[in-house]
Amino acid sequence: VTTTHAAELPAGMQQFDAQMERVRKQFDVPGIAVAIVKDGQVLLERGYGVRETGKPAPVQADTLFAIASNTKAFTAASLSILADEGKLSLDDKVIDHLPWFRMSDPYVSGEMRIRDLLAHRSGLSLGAGDLLFWPTTSYTTEEVVQRLAKVPLKGGFRDRYAYDNILYAVAQKVIEQVSGQSYAAFLQQRIFAPVGMRGTRFNADHLQPGDNAAVGHAKYDFTKLRTVAPLTWSNNSGAGGIYSSAHDMALWMNVQLAGGILPDGKPLFSAKRQHEMWSMITPIPIDEVHVPELAAARPNFAGYGEGWSLSDYRGHRMVWHTGGWPGMVSRLTLLPDQKLGVVVLTNQEVGAAFNAVTFQVLDAFLQVPPTDWTAAYAKLVEKADSDAGVSWKKHQDARAAHSTPSLPLRSYATTYRDPWYGDVVIRQDGKRLRLQFAKTAQLVGTLEHWQHDSFIVRWDDRSLNADAFVNFSLTPDGALREMRMEPISPLTDFSFDFQDLVLTPVPTETAAGK
């Protein structure tokens, strides 16, 4: 436990420790780490709860958490460093640095700029291609980027916002090509070391024996909180690989709030580049407020820059990002005009916890009448759970439960191939069918008949919370035409982009040849 400059915390923070315990209890969070910086000083860095449920080791300021997509700002900063050195421009075409780079549309392949890789406006749909690396797959980063050529575009190029991860793998390859270093080495030498982030690790594979690291937790079947196996994002670390601590992220926030100036007074990146990273490229539609108590958090504008989300809060520009990972979620928030930053790292999957803490801290420093953010976000969680229940009941009500499959079970047992993911195999195991994603060890489960030629895959790993409908269509002659999938629950993480797969049966001799 570490606290500095506690006397400078505002009056609204006097009961902060008790409020943190309330957040942990309300949202069933084993452990939280928080850091707050103001005017270049670290006012608070502290851990609450435990690294792993059922074990006594406490969360501390230097406990490592997966920061997931908070990594994207490091990728943008890396490109900024190279731009400041004149080794690239964010306006360069990607193919000028990676001649083999391809999207599914030749025009987009040729026109994609490095800045476009960061701004979520490529025409890819939400989370498109994420199954190439989520959950852990055996593909390499190079294979992920090469398979991007087969991922279909669902929107117009630079037309609208749709968050993706896969283009940050391309950004990682650009950094490696231009710098001549691995991305792990570049981050360590050019960012982690100069900033002073001594405990930070490039990804889960770089965790060392004895590291003070949190363990992720998920609610199995959306109910029972248990530990989860660590994810390895070694094949897309540019999008979300980094493990860091509240202590190290406080240093990172201070460099950001200082306009890129390092503790030794030297620039990590130029003020010009920071201005561009923090400038809106892609506008984001603003959602309606579904819980009245959250009205104060609704922004007047929202958009995305280079590795950063941009919006406003109570009249102040807010630069922020969240990170989502199996078993861990986080949020980093900056109010540049206040020289204020707060990071919240948690070892569970409910973003309500980090939002409640963040807005509570911001309100205390802005000295506005307090909102009970814990209660407000509890209502949002309750509504999301209720909506998921309504969705499931609609499926149940529409089900023709006494219908039967068109074909004998053995006829569905074959290898199916999607142009970008690759193979999904169905095998008959006695009286049941088993489904396996060939490159994803965790995606193995049992098919349960739902209705007609629709099944549900129940994954063996119940921490995934990603059971999916599996729908078969037939040719006029009664042969299998294709298999499509879609997540059942609206609570399933968007990175399980099953709906983007178009799986067709592979002729037996072709499958055998593979």
Predicted regions and their residues:
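Short, conserved catalytic-motif segment at the N-terminal edge
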Residues: 7-67, 87-89, 96-97, 103-104, ...
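Mid-domain, small-residue-enriched loop/turn segments at the edges of structured enzyme/sensor domains
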Residues: 113, 166-167
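Cytochrome P450
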Residues: 159-163
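Short, solvent-exposed loop/turn and secondary-structure capping segments
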Residues: 45-48, 127-133, 188, 201-206, ...
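Active/ligand-binding-proximal structured segments within catalytic/core domains
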Residues: 75
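Active-site helix/loop module of the DD-peptidase/beta-lactamase fold
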Residues: 31, 53, 58-61, 66-70, ...
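Catalytic loop of the DD-peptidase/beta-lactamase superfamily, centered on the K-T-G motif
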Residues: 7-45, 176-189, 193, 227-514
